[in-house]
Amino acid sequence: MTIPKHILDKFPKLSNDKLLNNLSLPSGRNKMILDTDTANEIDDQFALAWTLLSNDKIDLLGVTAEPYSFQHHKEELFEAYDIITNNKKIDSSNQELVNNYYNWVNGLIESKKHPNDIYFDTPKEGVEKSYQEIINIFKKLDINHEGKVFRGSHKYLENLDEPLDTESSQFIIDMCLKYPNEKIYVCAIGCLTNIASALLIKPEIIKNMVVVWTAGFPTFSFNHNKNSLNLVQDVYASQLLFEC
């Protein structure tokens, strides 16, 4: 998949010097937005807590909630479960599928559970759970969350001509425009839907928005990051970030 020319033409062309400056190693106290699917896995909660307790290092402008969902695994999980539990033939057409889901299926069998017993949050449910969990972390640290926490996209991008205008995407835009002469570090530890929507709505923020994204890292964690969950949830958003 490539990004259409009419989309890319909306973005300012940054010089090499500007790009290198934006990507240079930061020093001092920097303005940051944390973009997180906090209710998905415990690492986001640690990241948020560390950020909130690092006021000497980070000027936290706000926290934006991301959607998350494992629904894209559902069909393959059911297929692998059927193959394994019914002793169906394993050949070159399904070997990789079985390998990828073997431990997951085996865990279900040992627990006497069926894939039907697993509930897969929708992206809409995921973003709301993340929003509430962000507030929960603020409260546990006795830090006021008013004006600091924003709901994000309730779904993933379906095309690049219809960005999702949300509290989160607007907040990202507002902060980049408010501080045009400063780098705004948007640290994303989930999918890129909020960030991509902000870019599509206001392409000029590319000038001072620096995205730091956790995705595609080497891992021995079975299955979940095989193809980078943060990347594959919203392929349109991920592709835009690489090409714009």
Q: What positions do the PLM features span?
A:
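N-terminal acidic, glycine/proline-rich low-complexity segments
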Residues: 1-244
